[in-house]
Regions:
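Sequence-level detector for compositionally biased, low-complexity segments
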Residues: 1-177
Length: 177
């Protein structure tokens, strides 16, 4: 297990990723042997526990603001889903009523591919319009309002995972290689 944790940590090392970026795109990664094996294994275990057990981590204390959308309510409609993030303000707009704020800058720097984990979640929960009218009429489609509370909880937990992952990877930068 320690070897697996060590490899997981090395593959998350920002210096390793930067130095071997081109190689990582073209071939299988080569794992260097760093002097303090057990420190790297401990970081890898911590990262793995965060990434695998993201549903069990404590939710980050984001401020939630709910302002009723009187227009939508008067028309008998659900709030309009937006699912937009503004990293510069540290806010996430879920719909025309709900905004989460207090997202720390570190949460936006943890990337899964080319997007932050938070942006990835927002993209996955967006309502998509089906092009085929037959399917649209006859089948029950996804509605964000049915999953809103689940998404709020998930965003808070993934914020915790992102912040803690960035803290660990920043500590890796200072380690001797």
């Amino acid at each position: 297990e320690a070897i697996f944790h060590y490899c997981y940590a090395v593959l998350h090392d920002p210096i390793y990723r930067e130095k071997y970026a081109l190689n990582l795109k073209r071939e299988f990664p080569r794992i260097p042997f760093y002097p303090d094996f057990w420190q790297w294994a401990a970081w890898g275990e911590a990262l793995m526990n965060l990434h695998i057990g993201y549903e069990a981590v404590a939710p980050f204390a984001l401020a939630r603001r709910d302002v009723p959308d009187e227009k939508a309510r008067a028309a008998g409609l659900a709030p309009k889903a937006m699912l937009r993030a503004d990293a510069s303000l540290g806010t996430i707009s879920l719909d025309s009523e709900t905004t989460l704020s207090g997202v720390p800058p570190e949460a936006w720097t943890y990337k899964l591919g080319n997007r932050s984990a938070l942006e990835w979640i927002l993209d996955q929960y967006k309502e998509k319009k089906l092009k085929d009218p037959t399917i649209r009429e006859k089948f029950d489609t996804y509605r964000f309002k049915d999953y809103k509370e689940k998404v709020v909880d998930l965003l808070m937990r993934v914020t915790t995972v992102s912040v803690e992952t960035v803290a660990i990877t920043e500590a890796m930068k200072a380690e001797k290689r």
